[in-house]
Design a protein with these regions (language model features):
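Regulatory modules associated with amino-acid/nitrogen control
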Residues: 1-197
């Protein structure tokens, strides 16, 4: 590579870097103080809304760890987007304020800060199972209250529902037995008590 090609490549890389802002997750300070937060976003159920919400995260280099969307009020055409993201308190507050400014957004609630939220997730976990590992997989499934939803002579598919941490633990314990793959729904969350989110 000659010096002209190298200079051109450097110029292209600097333009690309300028087009994408630095991630708030990339600083060592940001990682040290980063906490996981579950945001509940009530939006109009119309085309393009999810793309606008996800675009806000993408444009600012915010990571989405989990995302679920469903209509919650058919008569008023409202949907709830549940987003799990990590960041410093300042980053989460910035995300919340930017979401609130989007036109189709009715409300944004940080369910993590209320400490009154219930979070659940469903996962289907496929595991190889022969001989002793078959017995071990079934014992672990029973301990975690996972249901067998499919079984062959060589594998199982378990269905497990619970807090994300419980599912993480179940998956980690299945790895040495013969974990094949996992499909997760993402987090669904709701606040406790009689009041709506």
């Amino acid at each position: 590579m000659n010096h002209v090609d190298r200079d051109l490549r450097t110029l292209q890389m600097s333009k690309t870097a300028a087009a994408y802002p630095p991630s708030p997750y990339s600083s060592p300070l940001g990682k040290a103080n980063a906490e996981s937060h579950t945001l509940s976003v009530l939006v109009d159920n119309e085309p393009g809304v999810l793309a606008r919400v996800v675009g806000l995260f993408s444009a600012r280099s915010f990571n989405i760890e989990s995302l679920t969307v469903a209509e919650v009020a058919h008569e008023t055409h409202l949907s709830r987007i549940t987003i799990v993201t990590s960041g410093t308190p300042e980053v989460i507050e910035q995300v919340r304020h930017q979401l609130e400014r989007l036109v189709p957004v009715h409300s944004v609630t940080d369910l993590t800060s209320s400490a009154r939220a219930i979070e659940r997730e469903l996962a289907m976990v496929k595991v190889r199972g022969r001989g002793d590992s078959r017995v071990e997989a079934l014992q672990l499934a029973e301990a975690f209250r996972a249901k067998v939803i499919d079984a062959t002579t060589e594998s199982f598919i378990f269905e497990i529902t619970g807090a994300p941490r419980k599912i993480d633990d179940f998956v980690d314990l299945m790895r040495p037995i013969g974990l094949v793959e996992v499909s997760r729904t993402g987090v669904a969350a709701i606040s406790r008590g009689p009041e709506p989110i």
